[in-house]
């Protein structure tokens, strides 16, 4: 039985390669039949905002990779992180079909998984 893995995205999408590399790792895990759970919290919430155009700034777009991960493993966003940033679920990209969860539920995800990796 594969290990249960939780990938926590808490960094903003731009300014470093941390998040992009995290999405690459998640994609590689899926290719190895490990289906990680993805949790977006803190500034990681900004990865999920609709109408982003990183290529306009010369940055790599992660939209298709994240959409694929959404289709395969699902994406969870902490509701409190949205609210703290003045965001609503309507601000999230519909392509990602994000499930908003409470901080208590996010804590449950931490407990349920054997391995936790943070980006």
Protein language model annotation of sequence segments:
Residues 7-20, 48-53:
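Short, glycine-rich nucleotide/cofactor-binding loops
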Residues 113:
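An anion/phosphate-binding loop that grips the pyrophosphate of nucleotide cofactors and donors
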Residues 19-38:
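Histidine-anchored nucleotide/phosphate-binding helix
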Residues 2-6:
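Extreme N-terminal starter segment of soluble prokaryotic enzymes
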Residues 51-56, 92-96:
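Short glycine-enriched, charge-decorated loop/helix-capping segments at active-site entrances
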Residues 42-45, 81-82:
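Short beta-alpha junction loops
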Residues 54-82:
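A glycine-rich helix N-cap at a beta->alpha junction
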Residues 97-104:
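Short acidic-hydrophobic, aromatic-tinged amphipathic segments that line or gate anion-handling sites
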């Amino acid at each position: 039985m594969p290990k249960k893995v939780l990938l926590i995205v808490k960094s903003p999408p731009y300014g470093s390669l941390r998040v992009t590399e995290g999405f690459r790792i998640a994609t590689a895990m899926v290719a190895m039949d490990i289906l990680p759970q993805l949790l977006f919290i803190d500034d990681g919430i900004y990865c999920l905002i609709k109408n982003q155009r990183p290529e306009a700034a010369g940055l790599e777009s992660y939209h298709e990779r994240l959409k694929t991960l959404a289709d395969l493993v699902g994406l969870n966003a902490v509701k409190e992180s949205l609210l703290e940033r003045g965001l609503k679920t309507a601000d999230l990209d519909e392509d990602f079909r994000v499930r908003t969860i409470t901080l208590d539920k996010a804590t449950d995800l931490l407990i349920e998984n054997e391995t936790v990796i943070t980006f």
